[in-house]
From Swiss-Prot:
Taxonomic placement: Bacteria, Pseudomonadati, Pseudomonadota, Gammaproteobacteria, Thiotrichales
Subunit structure, as described in the record: Homodimer. Heterotetramer of two MnmE and two MnmG subunits.
Gene: mnmE
Organism name: Francisella tularensis subsp. tularensis (strain SCHU S4 / Schu 4)
Cofactor(s) this protein cannot do without: K(+)
Record-linked SUPFAM superfamilies: P-loop containing nucleoside triphosphate hydrolases, TrmE connector domain
CC cofactor note: Binds 1 potassium ion per subunit.
Protein name in the entry: tRNA modification GTPase MnmE
Domain of life: Bacteria
Length: 450
């Protein structure tokens, strides 16, 4: 058990509120709490009492003692529920520090829960995901991960994989058993089952990352093409100033919305053109930089001279910026102002026709965006995931494919080696084998007090 010292932090958000919670965890948590309250605390009882700094009353509230290992961290934990005034809470923190506690680092309570086997690494990350979820579906999916749905799937997969590894390695170590790799259907069927499960988890992880991290959309195009109007139409409110004057948007304008429960981070940028205006030029530089960070680019145009516009044609539309736009970026061409046309072309491939001002075609555009990122809305089976999970699963998938190749070639030792590599990648998801650097990076992204 992790029992180095005792930590303290405010567990509720900053600012004023009806209640503020202070969390203390560690070997001296009970002793410190009893010094602060001058009470003997019973495990799992709510005790209403004063909180003192020496003999001076700071506040009164409810104190709950959770005796190890039946606590969030697996250590002795005390929660002090006081009035939610930052000055009062900080006075209680100072009193706890005077009694021997130290300030917790970001995510240290959850890190201790992980080190004390109360949570695996995927569940620990889900704690942050559920706190930061920006949609109802994202919150529900994070709850599934926190309950262990993702971890159970990985652990079930590991169980099958380890059994297969043992079987393969036994056949190598004990050749007298005369197992023929090319003919043994047990190995073939087990490997094929593992392959299919990893593929399914791979697809689920992709959905989970979309829900956990959202999609970043960048609106780009020439001035006055209707980018700001499109931002307002997608957001359903007036987020950006819209005028008939080209170059109105001179800086980055951000809006966070949901499309079918999927978080979307939409960024409106300055119109791309050569400008002598220092402020507008800086906005254009920022726009180019943001394009490189996008999951998708919505290239807004009101030019209908070529409805079959392709990426190479952007060189003609904005030649001065063509070389600065990544050639592998996912671009949807949004043809705006169709209300001015007598005949509206049909949507096709990456070309969507809309009128942002009149809200025509916006739903079709939203549907197109979700399809482009591969979101399937199967929220009953989706759990949140991180990019590192996707990387691990993708690597595991590549090596399980190599394992199948080695099986077909009859290379038992290389097959066993590939299975071991797959196991290591899967173990990294739940934290079975994780470096201190990785753990530090993960938990440092948490808020203080969690």
């Amino acid at each position: 058990m992790y029992t180095k010292d005792t930590i303290v932090a405010i567990a509720t958000p900053q600012g004023n509120g009806g209640i503020g919670i202070i969390r203390i965890s560690g070997i001296d948590a009970l002793a410190i709490a009893e010094k602060l309250t001058k009470k003997q605390l019973k495990p799992r009882y709510a005790t209403f009492c004063n909180v003192y700094n020496d003999n001076e009353i700071i506040d009164h509230g409810i104190i709950i003692f959770f005796k190890a290992p039946l606590s969030y961290t697996g250590e002795d934990v005390v929660e002090i529920q006081a009035h939610g005034n930052p000055f009062i809470l900080n006075l209680i923190i100072k009193a706890a520090l005077n009694c021997g506690a130290r300030m917790a680092k970001a995510g240290e309570f959850t890190e201790r829960a992980f080190l004390n086997n109360k949570l695996d690494l995927a569940q620990a990350e889900a704690v942050a995901d559920i706190i930061n979820a920006s949609s109802e579906i994202a919150a529900k999916s994070a709850a599934k991960s926190l309950q262990g749905d993702f971890s159970k799937e990985i652990n079930n997969l590991l169980e099958k994989l380890i059994y297969l590894r043992m079987y393969v390695e036994a056949s190598i170590d004990f050749p007298e058993e005369e197992i023929n790799f090319l003919e043994d259907q047990k190995i073939h069927s087990s490997l094929e089952e593992i392959y299919k499960v990893i593929l399914a988890v791979k697809n689920s992880c992709k959905q989970g990352v979309i829900l956990a991290e959202g999609i970043t959309l960048i609106l780009v195009g020439k001035p006055n093409a209707g980018k700001s109007s499109l931002l307002n139409a997608l957001a359903g409110k007036e987020s950006a100033i819209v005028t008939s004057i080209a170059g109105t948007t001179r800086d980055i304008v951000k809006e966070h919305i949901q499309i079918n429960g999927v978080p979307m981070h939409i960024i409106d940028t300055a119109g791309l053109r050569n400008s002598d205006d220092i402020i507008e030029s800086e906005g254009i530089k920022r726009a180019i930089k943001k394009i490189q960070e996008a999951d998708q680019v919505l290239f807004v145009t009101d030019d209908y001279t070529n409805s079959q516009v392709k990426f190479s044609d952007i060189k003609e539309i904005i030649p001065e910026f063509y070389d600065q736009i990544p050639k592998d970026i996912d671009i949807t061409y949004v043809h705006n102002k169709i209300d001015l046309l007598k005949e509206v072309p049909h949507n096709h491939a990456n070309h969507i026709y809309i009128s942002a001002e009149n809200n025509i075609g916006i739903d079709k555009l939203k549907e197109h965006i979700l399809n482009k990122v591969g979101y399937t809305n199967q929220n009953e089976s989706i759990y949140t995931a991180r990019e590192r999970h996707v990387t691990a699963i993708n690597n595991a998938f590549e090596h399980i494919k190599l394992a199948k190749e080695q099986l077909e070639l009859g290379n038992g030792e290389l097959l066993a080696e590939e299975l071991l590599i797959v196991q290591e990648y899967l173990n990294s998801i739940t934290g079975e084998f994780s470096s201190d650097d990785l753990l530090g990076e993960i938990f440092s992204s948490f808020c203080i007090g969690k």
